[in-house]
Amino acid sequence: TRSGDIRYCEFAVTRIVYKGEDANLVSVRNITDRKQMEDELQQSLVKLENTIQNTLQAMAKIQEARDPYTTGHQLRVAALAQEIAKEMYLPEEWIRGIHVAALIHDIGKIYVPAEILSRPSKLTTSEFALVKTHPSVGYDILKTIEFPWPIADVVLQHHERLDGSGYPRGLKTGNILLEAQILAVADVVEAMSSHRPYRPAHSLDTTLEEISKNKGRLYEPDVVDSCLWLITGKGFKFN
C-alpha cells in the first residue's frame, strides 16, 4: 500500500467466453488477515515445540541424575539417530519425531533403583530382568501424552530386534517401527563406545563390527549402512 503496509492477495483465474471469444476472468481476494493468523499460529507451534523439547530434556536430566555413568547418553543417541534418519532421507516430521523419542528413550529407568544402574559388577538375573522393564515403564509414562509422533511406541520398541530376540515383546521383522529400529542402532553404538561402571568403552572398530555383523539379523540393514557411512564416510563423532 502507499503507507508501506504489506497486503497479501490471492488470485484466481477462470477461463470464460466473453462476447464469443475465450477470455480470462481474474478475481483478487485480500487474505492479509488469514496470512497473519497463519503466521501467528506457526509462531505458537514453534514456541510449543520448543517448550516440549525443553521439557523432554529436563525429563532426561532427571533420569540421568540417578545414573551418572550415562549422563548425556540420550542426547548423544538423539544426535546420531537424527543424522541416520537424515541419511535415509526420511521426511522432516519423522526426523523430528525420532529425535524427540531418542531424547527420552530411557525414561523408564527412573523405576530402576540407582544402585542397580550404577553397580560396577555383573547384575543378577532378577536385577537384569528389572532393568529390562524400562521400555515398558517408559511406554506407560508417555502413552497418555498426545505427541504428533508415536513416541511411546518407539520408546517401547527400542530394544526389540529383527530376529525376535529383543525385549519386552520379542517383536520380529515387520512388526517393529522404523523409528525404533533407527533408535536401536544409535543406542547400541553410543552405549558400546562409552564407559560403563562394569566395563571400559569399546573401540570404534569393535562397536561398528557389532552392528555390521548383525545387519539383517538384529538390526535393519538400511539403518546399519547409513550409520556406518555416517561414521566412516562422513566422520560423525559424538560431542
Residue ranges of predicted features:
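Sensory input modules used in signal transduction
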Residues: 1, 13-15, 28, 173
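PAS-family sensory domains
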Residues: 1-4, 161
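Compact sensory input modules in signal-transduction proteins
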Residues: 4, 11-13, 98
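Short loop/turn elements at sensory-signaling interfaces that couple input to output
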Residues: 11-24
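Conserved Rossmann-like nucleotide-binding pocket used by diverse enzymes
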Residues: 24-27, 103
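PAS-associated C-terminal cap
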Residues: 29-43
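Metal-dependent catalytic cores of enzymes that make or break cyclic nucleotides
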Residues: 40, 46, 53, 57-239
